[in-house]
A protein has these predicted regions:
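N-terminal auxiliary segments of SAM/dcSAM-dependent transferases
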Residues: 1-23
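A broadly tuned "polar low-complexity/structure-edge" signature
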Residues: 13-16, 61, 79, 86
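S-adenosylmethionine/decaboxylated-SAM
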Residues: 21-48, 65, 70-167
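Short alpha-helical patches at coil-to-helix transitions and adjacent helical residues
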Residues: 50-57, 82
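Conserved alpha-helix/loop element of class I SAM-dependent methyltransferases that forms part
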Residues: 54-67
Length: 167
């Protein structure tokens, strides 16, 4: 596998894999599926890697069902894990009003790099930042996802900006 860049984005995927993913993205963007049926058919656009990742999160969620407490997603970036955990909570613990999901991130990328981080091309100041208004978008989106779960009148998911943790 070679390290490669498409449009300046860091990727460790092969060129052929990136090309196939771009074609799938174009298929999604130019789909013949009506808007009102798109969400029910998103599986059409999932690769085995993406589905494996979702199934892994499903496995991890099932491991903690009998454990009291909340779910914390540190470094949430785009919020996919938090969104999936909220959805899984709605599936496996629909009436557990005490299980909450917290998504933490600075949303500004790496503010500094330590030599312990290594010399990967990923390790650059500002890398992994989101768009400027993303934290607000993410919270609104997570609220929408949660609104589709049972007992949606009780807030069960939060996106928290400016995570300052020292280890």
């Amino acid at each position: 596998m070679t390290k490669s860049n498409i449009k300046g984005k860091l990727s460790f995927k092969s060129v052929s894999e990136q090309s196939a993913e771009m074609k799938i993205l174009k298929n999604l963007q130019s789909r013949k599926i009506p808007d009102n049926e798109l969400l029910e058919n998103l599986g059409m656009f999932l690769s085995s890697k993406n589905l494996s990742r979702i199934l892994c999160l499903d496995f991890l969620y099932k491991l903690q069902i009998k454990i009291n407490g909340n779910i914390f997603d540190f470094g949430t970036r785009w919020g996919q894990n938090a969104s999936l955990f909220s959805t899984l909570r709605g599936i496996y613990e629909p009436f557990n009003r005490h299980k909450r999901v917290f998504a933490f991130d600075t949303f500004s990328g790496f503010n500094k790099i330590n030599k312990k981080d290594g010399k990967s091309r990923l390790m650059k100041v500002g890398n992994l930042k989101t768009s400027q208004d993303y934290p607000k978008f993410l919270q609104n989106h997570l609220d929408l996802i949660d609104s589709l779960n049972p007992i949606s009148h009780i807030k069960k998911i939060w996106s928290i900006k400016e995570m300052h943790l020292k280890f």
